[in-house]
């Protein structure tokens, strides 16, 4: 039969789930237990499953296997979950995970393990753990460093796993960092909520079949210590029946030699004289996987006769002759009644059961005139209540405090297998705060998968002293080894918040229980048997089990009514199985609204933690963080939206201001141009000419464009005579003035001017700054201004009115010409002004204010009219 001890070799978790079962290797002397995801198992087989090491070993010759065959290349050990490497060797999966440079060739099957990227200096480091315990193995394999930046210590991954130094950073997120701390800096990881400390996972090795067949454990009793006044534990009291001493179950005795053999077949009898507890009391609470399941062994009912009690034994008055038979899977009492089965039994539960059984036996012996002093230090029934209602501040319970007070200490003499057996028994988790699977799923797993019987050999738990100083330990080396084995017991801790709620709830329940003074009576006529009343927050068995698993079971003060048989605080169970729950219901009903709310809160949280396949508390913490982050992002988004609207409004205001500035700048530029023209066309700088002599040009006649819808009689061609003119200051006309304006100014004459011809050369200099020297197109003003006399006769008032009327739509050159007319007072005649006013009725002429100038018609040739 296969003995399943411990959890996963990689993650040290003892739970299995439907999508990630915990699988045990079926190889000979192999204790490998891994999760499907932790070991990279592609498909879980229906039959037997073998790890990679056992699969390889089965194909090798028996004599070719030695200690170095399967030794890990990253540590000095050859046990555990191993995988093939790229160097044709072996390496632990846990070593590959915690050394960053190691990777897997296939991440799904997690093999082979690639070691080429591991730096050489990691193989040269010294493991400080091995250096203290096994100096020869200190330099073997590769070491990981302490995650503390200033720490220089290094150690093997498997050594850190045995010491409980491995951690996972960022366990709440998907990016998990596998790291480890030395013993000096481990406190940092324990205090950091973002770091998950992996519990210690000591290796469990089996002996060979020859050594495992038959073993002997020698137990020698020592002087008994005084009974402890209190016992701190978190397990529920097991209901028992205390009518007669013959019905007492489990009253054991001490022996000198115990023969530990394999479990006899069904129906056989073991006459050993040793107290044999039910195997389920020693079974670690392993959650069965979808493939691997544990078939519960039949628990042998134990009986003891009243006549066998005497004063000769070291533990009890006489050596009780016990008959243990494997007849039923449920513990059966002598009177035919059955004990309620427990879905999960721990070391603490077993010890409390034994305490109750022995106390009940003491009460029965007291009723039969046997003094309590004959029980060799065991408490009487009147002292039992002090053990029942004590709720500890923590669920961290040592083995010494779990064992019955007054029990003898034993020296363990024998082979190493007994040490491993006791170690496997005592290192089982005391209470489970994690989720477990219900019994229905376990039964379904058992029907689909190959059953495995729990064949752990029975053993007797020796007690360590529970005094204030920790108790005395035996001087033998075996007892010292036993103490070292049970020292690293891992017990999960209840949070401060839960402990406060437990204390408040317990006080409220005690007050409610004390308020009830009327005892309950059974309505059935049959004989009634009493059990200790347990006032719990949860009234049904499922919630009670969940509270036991979470370490939050509440026990009310039990009375000392075991001697009398009835009590005011006892729940009554009738013979036909029905219960009178009126008193218990009244005790469980909350008296205040706060109690009701706390009860609903506890029931909901226990239900979630018991049935959910994930860490509910951690998930709630993640949801709260997500909600806070979402709220922060919403506030940030609202602020950004307000900022965007503000910038849009500011941009629109700036655009309006920019448009106004452009218009003002254009107007200022026009005024500046007018001032420049007025400055350059000062009339004092122009010398009057005698007469303009018209002369035919030597080249082809100049073509002047005319509007298409007006008569040529209103306009005259401007001809360029060849005659030269004389000036006192030839350089008075600057080049910045438009040439057309300069030509017009040169044709201006007075009545007293001489008759000398003037060479204006208008045709070759008619240009604008925009055309860069090209001949300037004729405008209505230029064609209308054909006589210098008419231009000079235009009054300044009329020229200013004409300029104001046509300023906005005029071209820059036209505006310059009108400005020039304004600057010659008394030299423009009224007839020219009248002609200019008539031009706005023609196509291509001047337009009213606010309308752009229309395009001019194509130029046409014009002949001189002789004027």
UniProtKB/Swiss-Prot annotation:
* Ranges of Low complexity composition bias in the record: 538-550, 574-585
GO BP, one example?
chromatin organization
Which residues does the annotation list for site: Required for binding to histone H3 methylated at 'Lys-4' in vitro?
4
Q: What happens when the gene is disrupted?
A: RNAi-mediated knockdown results in developmental defects such as slow growth, protruding vulva, and a reduced brood size. RNAi-mediated knockdown results in germ line defects, resulting in no embryos or impaired oogenesis. RNAi-mediated knockdown suppresses the multivulval phenotype of the lin-15A-lin15B n765 mutant. RNAi-mediated knockdown shortens the lifespan of daf-2 e1370 mutants.
Q: Which Pfam families match?
A: PHD_2, zf-HC5HC2H_2
Entry coiled-coil feature ranges = none
CC annotations in GO: chromatin; chromosome; condensed chromosome; histone methyltransferase complex; MOZ/MORF histone acetyltransferase complex; nucleus
Q: What is this protein called?
A: Zinc finger protein zfp-1
């Amino acid at each position: 039969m296969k003995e399943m001890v411990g959890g996963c070799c990689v993650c040290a978790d003892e739970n299995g789930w439907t999508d990630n079962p915990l699988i045990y290797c079926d190889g000979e002397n192999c204790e490998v237990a891994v999760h499907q995801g932790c070991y990279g198992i592609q498909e879980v087989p229906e039959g037997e499953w073998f790890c990679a090491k056992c699969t390889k070993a089965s194909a090798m010759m028996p004599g070719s296997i030695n200690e170095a065959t399967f030794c890990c290349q990253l540590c000095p050990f050859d046990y555990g979950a191993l995988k093939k490497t790229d160097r044709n060797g072996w390496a632990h999966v846990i070593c590959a995970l915690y050394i960053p440079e190691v990777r897997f060739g296939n991440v799904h099957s997690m093999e082979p393990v690639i070691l080429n990227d591991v730096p050489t200096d990691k193989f040269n480091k010294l493991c400080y753990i091995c250096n203290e315990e096994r100096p020869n193995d200190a330099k073997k394999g590769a070491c990981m460093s302490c995650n503390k930046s200033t720490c220089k210590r290094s150690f093997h991954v498997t050594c850190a796993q045995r010491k409980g130094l491995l951690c996972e950073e960022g366990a709440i997120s998907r990016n998990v960092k596998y790291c480890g701390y030395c013993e000096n800096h481990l406190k940092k990881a324990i205090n950091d909520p973002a770091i998950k400390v992996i519990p210690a996972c000591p290796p469990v090795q089996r002996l060979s079949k020859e050594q495992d067949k038959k073993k002997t454990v020698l137990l020698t009793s020592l002087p008994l210590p005084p009974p402890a006044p209190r016992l701190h534990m978190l397990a529920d009291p097991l209901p028992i029946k205390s009518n007669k001493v013959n019905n007492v179950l489990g009253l054991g005795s001490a022996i000198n030699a115990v023969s530990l053999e394999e479990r006899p077949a069904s129906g056989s009898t073991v006459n050993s004289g040793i107290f044999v507890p039910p195997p389920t009391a020693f079974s670690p609470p392993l959650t069965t996987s979808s493939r691997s399941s544990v078939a519960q062994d039949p628990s042998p009912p134990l009986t003891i006769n009243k006549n066998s009690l005497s004063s000769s034994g070291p533990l009890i008055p006489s050596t009780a002759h016990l008959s243990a038979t494997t007849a039923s899977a449920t513990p059966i009492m002598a009177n035919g009644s059955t004990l309620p089965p427990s879905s999960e039994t721990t070391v603490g539960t077993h010890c409390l059961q034994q305490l109750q059984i022995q106390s009940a036996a003491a009460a029965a012996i007291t009723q039969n005139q046997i003094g309590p002093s004959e029980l060799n230090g065991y408490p009487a029934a009147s002292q039992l209540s002090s053990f029942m209602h004590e709720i500890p501040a923590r669920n961290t319970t040592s083995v010494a405090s779990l064992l019955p007070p007054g029990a003898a200490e034993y020296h363990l003499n024998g082979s190493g297998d007994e040490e491993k057996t006791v170690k496997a028994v005592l290192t089982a988790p005391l209470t489970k705060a994690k989720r477990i699977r219900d019994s229905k799923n376990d039964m379904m797993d058992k029907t689909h998968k190959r059953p495995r019987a729990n064949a752990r050999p029975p053993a007797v738990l020796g007690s360590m002293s529970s005094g204030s100083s920790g108790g005395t330990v035996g001087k033998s080396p075996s007892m010292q080894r036993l103490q070292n084995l049970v020292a690293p017991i891992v017990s999960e801790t209840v949070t401060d918040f839960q402990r406060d709620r437990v204390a408040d709830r317990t006080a409220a329940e005690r007050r409610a229980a004390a308020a009830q003074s009327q005892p309950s009576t059974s309505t059935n006529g049959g004989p009634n048997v009493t059990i200790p009343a347990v006032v719990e927050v949860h009234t049904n068995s499922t919630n009670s089990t969940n509270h036991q698993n979470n370490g939050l079971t509440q026990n009310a003060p039990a009375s000392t009514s075991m001697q009398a048989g009835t009590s005011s605080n006892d729940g009554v169970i009738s013979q036909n199985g029905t219960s009178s729950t009126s008193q218990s219901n009244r005790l469980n009903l909350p008296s205040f609204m706060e109690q009701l709310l706390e009860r609903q809160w506890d029931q909901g949280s226990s239900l979630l933690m018991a049935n959910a396949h994930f860490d509910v508390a951690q998930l709630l913490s993640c949801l709260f963080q997500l909600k806070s982050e979402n709220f922060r992002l919403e506030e940030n988004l609202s602020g950004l939206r307000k900022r965007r609207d503000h910038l849009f409004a500011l941009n629109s205001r700036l655009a309006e201001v920019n448009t106004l500035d452009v218009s003002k700048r254009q107007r200022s530029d026009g005024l500046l141009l007018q001032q420049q023209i007025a400055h350059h066309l000062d009339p004092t700088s122009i010398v009057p000419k005698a007469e303009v002599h018209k002369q035919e040009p030597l080249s082809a006649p100049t073509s002047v464009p005319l509007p298409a819808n007006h008569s040529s009689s209103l306009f005259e061609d401007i001809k360029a005579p060849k005659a030269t003119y004389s000036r006192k200051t030839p350089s008075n006309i600057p080049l910045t003035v438009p040439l057309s304006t300069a030509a017009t100014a040169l044709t201006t004459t007075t009545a007293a001017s001489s008759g000398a011809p003037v060479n204006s050369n208008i045709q070759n200099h008619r240009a604008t700054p925009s055309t860069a020297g090209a001949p300037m197109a004729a405008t209505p003003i230029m064609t209308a201004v054909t006589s210098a006399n008419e231009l000079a006769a235009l009054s300044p008032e009329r020229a200013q009115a004409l300029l104001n009327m046509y300023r906005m739509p005029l071209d820059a050159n036209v505006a310059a010409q009108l400005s020039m007319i304004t600057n010659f007072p008394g030299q423009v005649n009224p007839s020219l002004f009248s002609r200019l006013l008539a031009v706005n009725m023609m196509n291509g002429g001047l337009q009213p204010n606010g309308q752009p100038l229309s395009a001019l018609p194509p130029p046409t040739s014009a002949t001189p009219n002789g004027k």
